[in-house]
Amino acid sequence: MMNIYEIAEDSFRINAYIPEYGLGFSQFLIRDEEPLLIHTGPRAMFPLVHEAVASLIDPSTLRWIGFSHFEADECGSLHEWQEAAPMATPVCSLVGKLVSVDDFAPKNPAKGMTDGEELTTGKHTFRFLQTPHVPHCWEAGLFHDTTTNTLYCSDLLHQNGDVEPLTSDSVTDRARQTMLEMEAGPLAGYLPYAVGTDTTLKRIAAEKPTTVATMHGSVYTGDGEKAILEYAAMLKEVCGA
């Protein structure tokens, strides 16, 4: 069952908790003149996500499908969404468009974004941040809704567990525990820590969002700059050299 929660004006977190994984998966729908879905979820979740989206908009009117990088929980049901919404166009980094997305889903070629480029969907404007290997993958990027000051941060601030949809409390301790669990198991190396990681995280923090919307875990509301800098320090401690 999908849980729907409005995290900002006309911006909805659509979440399913999967007990066997101990993990929640969130998609975000921005209801606007040109509706935008951030993350599709994997193919197996498509019927649930589609039903949830249908409770908020006519799903056939979906115009944009945004995602950080090429991975099943980010864009695995892209084909299904393009069948359900004929005008739905992927929006991702230019690198993602060139190296993966247009080959995978040629029906509607992706809008490839470069760093600082903006997409307007009606009332909302999204600034694209090119963030190679943050959270992971060469083509990674993030979307900042400058209208609501919401940063859609993909796997950053990842927290395991069945947690509340929105919190003003720090999520750093949860994120640290999650990273320690990941590093101790077969999924170690989930978030690579490279030469440019800290610089990229500081550049993301400089956006000063007031809402930070992670795919896995509670959305954080408050001083987003502080939250991301705390996360950056934690990541350096756990994963850095």
Regions found by a protein language model. Name each.
Residues 13-19, 41-43, 67-69, 127-133, ...:
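Short, flexible loop segments at the rims of nucleotide/cofactor-binding pockets, characterized by
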Residues 86-88, 221-241:
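Short acidic, glycine/proline-enriched helix-loop-strand junctions
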Residues 45-91:
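Active-site metal-binding motif and surrounding structural segment of the metallo-beta-lactamase
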